[in-house]
Amino acid sequence: MQWLRAAHLVTLGFNTDVGMREDQWEPVTVDNCDKVRGPFYHGTKADLSIGDLLSPGFPSNYDEGRVLNHIYFSSLLEPAIWGAELAVAFATSGERGRIYIIEPTGPFEDDPNLTNKRFPGNPTKSYRTQKPLKVIGVLNDWQGHAEADIHRMVEALQDLKRRGRAIIED
């Protein structure tokens, strides 16, 4: 989910009226992540099977030529849908993205690219880990976004990159 900026949360349909003061939010760290309950989702272009592992150390779907040290996931379906759709859009493959139900195999933390940016806390429930994610299920029945919305998001992300503002904290 590293591609998503907090400024896009409202546009993407996330409820940013979280009714939370900054002092009420408890950051998710590698030391307390065991308190976070799934299910967890990962959206991608990769064709995987149950039991497969998703690991960091592979090229980013969104930043050509960059190898990521983390792998990203969410406990909300919406970020996974965007992840799947944008991975396919940037690959220009024309196929449908895939969403997997995953299980972290090690500690994880809040995704710093989204946490405490425009809104307090982590309203997208997005996380990252340096350990593999195990595929424990496949979600086939999910509602994607309109092609026009995906196109607008791709254009916005490309514009950020052109302006040197598409920085991924990995």
Predicted ranges, named:
Residues 58, 88, 158-161:
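Generic secondary-structure transition motif, activating predominantly at the C-termini of alpha-helices
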Residues 77-91:
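Short active-site loop/helix that positions an aromatic residue
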Residues 3-5, 18-22, 35, 45, ...:
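Active-site and NAD+-binding cores of ADP-ribose-processing enzymes
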Residues 3-71, 85-86:
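ADP-ribose/NAD+-binding catalytic cleft of ART/PARP-like enzymes
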